């Protein structure tokens, strides 16, 4: 059982003019193996900065990240990343993209090829495996990105607004796919999003972050992700607590945005 511990993380960025920005302050959080966490908040609350620290792309100013007791000091195959733009090799085929990580560890054997084909089947791309990535739609490219991440067998999957650029219908289908993969693989997932609805549907735990400095403002434990594994997401939205929680969070973020605007006007 892998456990991710975010221990009292702070992050300060120094600016060229000699000033600095406190992006995160005293963020502490623990995730057990298989948890699905969504992180939400207004622009400037540090949610992407936090994800980049967990990924090992940034070193925090203070505090530490550990996975199974081992300190995170840089990127690792134990933590897979899915970006808003798929960051795929567009000239390669779908199958070559998904198999890229395993191939970096050595020649693909029959077992690994079978795993790649299984992942393509899971994300619904078996019929497109020989297509070049540039021939695919945005939604299909994000399916490739998910499969490629899973092919590396990470303990933790980090998702930085992976569905933000998709149209509404494709986004809903991808949300259902994320829930399916979460339940089938048992992976720990951290998902960053600007969408309140997405955060509610794709988080059994949901963090609302506040800005300047970025910090955890409130945490929710929600039933909607578990419900969405076996139900149409449009049906999940009819749950009596869904609309209530949605309005509560929208009001919370609206107040944060208003406070930011007020500071700017008086500065």
Please place each PLM-identified region on the residue numbering:
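Conserved ABC ATPase "signature" region
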Residues: 110-128, 180
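Conserved ABC transporter NBD signature motif
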Residues: 63-75
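Signature (C-motif/LSGGQ) region and adjacent switch/coupling loops
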Residues: 20, 75, 95, 121, ...
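Short helical segment in ABC ATPase nucleotide-binding domains corresponding to the A-loop/adjacent helical element
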Residues: 95-103, 113, 117, 221
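Hydrophobic anchor residue at the start of the ABC signature
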Residues: 146
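The feature captures the beta-strand-to-loop junction immediately N-terminal to the Walker
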Residues: 40-42
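Conserved signature/switch motifs of ABC ATPase nucleotide-binding domains
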Residues: 131-134, 152
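Helix-to-loop junction immediately C-terminal to a conserved catalytic motif
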Residues: 55
């Amino acid at each position: 059982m892998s456990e991710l511990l975010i221990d009292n993380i702070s992050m300060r960025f120094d600016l060229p003019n000699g000033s600095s920005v406190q992006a995160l302050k005293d963020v502490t959080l623990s995730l057990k193996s298989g948890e699905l966490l969504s992180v939400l908040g207004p622009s400037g609350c540090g949610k992407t900065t936090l994800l980049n620290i967990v990924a090992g792309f940034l070193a925090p100013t203070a505090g530490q990240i550990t996975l199974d007791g081992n300190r995170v000091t840089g990127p690792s195959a134990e933590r897979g990343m899915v970006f808003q733009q798929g960051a795929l090799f567009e000239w390669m085929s779908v199958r070559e993209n998904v198999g890229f990580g395993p191939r970096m560890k050595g020649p693909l054997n029959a077992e690994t090829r079978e795993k790649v084909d299984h992942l393509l089947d899971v994300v619904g791309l078996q019929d497109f495996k020989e297509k070049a990535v540039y021939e695919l739609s945005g939604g299909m490219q994000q399916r490739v990105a998910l499969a490629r991440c899973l092919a590396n067998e990470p303990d933790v999957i980090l998702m930085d607004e992976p569905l933000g650029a998709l149209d509404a219908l494709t986004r809903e289908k991808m949300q259902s796919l994320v829930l399916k993969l979460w339940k089938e693989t048992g992976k720990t997932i951290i998902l960053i999003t600007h969408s309140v609805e997405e955060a509610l549907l794709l988080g059994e735990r949901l963090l609302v972050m506040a800005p300047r400095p970025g910090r955890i403002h409130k945490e929710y434990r929600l039933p909607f992700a578990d419900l969405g594994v076996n139900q149409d997401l449009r049906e999940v939205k009819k749950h009596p607590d869904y609309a209530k929680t949605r309005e509560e969070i929208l009001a919370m973020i609206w107040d944060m945005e208003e406070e930011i605007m007020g500071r700017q006007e008086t500065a």
